[in-house]
Amino acid sequence: MVFPLLNIYRIATFDPGEKTLSAASGAWWQDLPARYIRTTTYLGLALFSYAYTFPLDRAAVLSYDWMLLILARNVAIGYLLYGGWHHFLYQSRYVRKMTSRKFNPKFPSQKQWDHDRFWSTVGFCIQSAIEIGIMHLWATGKVEYYLDFWQYPLWSVAWMAWVPYWHDFHFWFIHRQLHMGVLYKWVHSLHHKSFNPGPWSGMSMHPVETTIYFSSALVPALFFPQVNIPNSYCTE
């Protein structure tokens, strides 16, 4: 049960620990602390982005001003997260201390870094296009949403709690399909060209796979009423 918390401590103190994959054999609840921290971080980023870079009041008309804002925000967050971890793990003054923690002692090549960063950036553009489409549907009234969180408090809380599990199921399902036949050969194999994974590798995917991956947002966004909390663009 303490495995995730112990690893968080080891990362903070640069304790190399042991090179084992023992976490994979543990019970599902052993990963809850790490999962909670990860999900809470993503939720915080989402709320911050929504509060300051979500111009729903302008989204009824497709125009470059607000669409470029969405793209710039997603690219900036991506480079901050992945680029920040990349710098910390491979270019900062702590690299030597963390080398002993690597399962693969070899560092990724510059060619792989460029490959992963390029396809991740393409992914940020696809992510932005999907978000822009959803925003436009909300703003034009073609998809239902409500502004008052307390209008349906139980539904609002349940929806926020359900979405991470839906995302995990969606990822599990599509990942199984992507490892089959033609989809693997022509689509998913690009992701597996990251032979020595780094922070940029997770989002380094073929555009088709990226589109399928972010399609997880379509089910909750298009088929369930959404709560849009007032932000700096809409205060009523």
Question: Which residues fall in each region the model found?
Answer:
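Non-catalytic, topology-defining segments of multipass membrane proteins
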Residues: M1-F173, Q177, W186, S194-A221
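Juxtamembrane loop segments immediately following a transmembrane helix
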Residues: V182-S194, T235-E236
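C-terminal transmembrane module of eukaryotic multi-pass membrane proteins
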Residues: I212-E236
